């Protein structure tokens, strides 16, 4: 290895910079172009500020078209309040007395 001038900053050392500039391309060759390209393109790591996505707001006149739903009555227990056993017996009795079917 060649001796490096100690007065040079580390990012200006020979061989520290690639000969070609970085591009926006994401092909395999460009992803392995340099360490920065590998980290940002290959691994997808970026430490820049994240852009806040703006919510798509509805037009102001869209509120007119919304119809308020009527309040539903409180839930009532469905089925026979006497219990499942008695209701089964009741159904059996009705089927016995109904000769139509």
Swiss-Prot record:
Motif (Nuclear localization signal, RNA-binding (TAR), and protein transduction): 49-57
Crosslinked positions (Glycyl lysine isopeptide (Lys-Gly) (interchain with G-Cter in ubiquitin)): 71
Record-annotated site: Essential for Tat translocation through the endosomal membrane: 11
Residues where Zn(2+) 2 binds: 25, 27, 30
Region called Transactivation, residue ranges: 1-48
Miscellaneous section: HIV-1 lineages are divided in three main groups, M (for Major), O (for Outlier), and N (for New, or Non-M, Non-O). The vast majority of strains found worldwide belong to the group M. Group O seems to be endemic to and largely confined to Cameroon and neighboring countries in West Central Africa, where these viruses represent a small minority of HIV-1 strains. The group N is represented by a limited number of isolates from Cameroonian persons. The group M is further subdivided in 9 clades or subtypes (A to D, F to H, J and K).
UniProt protein name: Protein Tat
């Amino acid at each position: 290895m060649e001796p490096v001038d100690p007065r040079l900053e580390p990012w200006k050392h020979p061989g520290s910079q690639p000969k070609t500039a970085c591009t926006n391309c994401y092909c395999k060759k460009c992803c392995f172009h340099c360490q920065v390209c590998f980290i940002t393109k290959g691994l997808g790591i970026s430490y820049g500020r994240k852009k806040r996505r703006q919510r798509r707001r509805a037009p102001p006149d869209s509120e007119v078209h919304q119809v308020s739903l009527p309040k539903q009555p409180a839930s009532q227990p469905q089925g026979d309040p006497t219990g499942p056993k008695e209701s089964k017996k009741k159904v059996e009795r009705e089927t016995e007395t109904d000769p139509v079917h």
